[in-house]
């Protein structure tokens, strides 16, 4: 996870910028979108440092609550996660594989709900 952590930290700003650009059409306010992006990034960074990306799964539950509170469609979280995965792939390529694999698994869980 060390390589993924280093790559994520060095490219996190660009990943989050891409994500904000791609997520403009959703029904969250820019502040709430920024909060979701920020805390997901913080949790990904911490989980990579701890050596287990699955620690971030609790963050997905929090994002679901945030979207529900703002009366957003559940599909928006799937869209958000796909966009995050794409931003990771685009900015850190194969070094981000643990992150994109985790995001893909979380997307599949969300689709199954």
Please place each PLM-identified region on the residue numbering.
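Core of compact, soluble alpha-helical bundle domains
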Residues: 1-82, 86-113
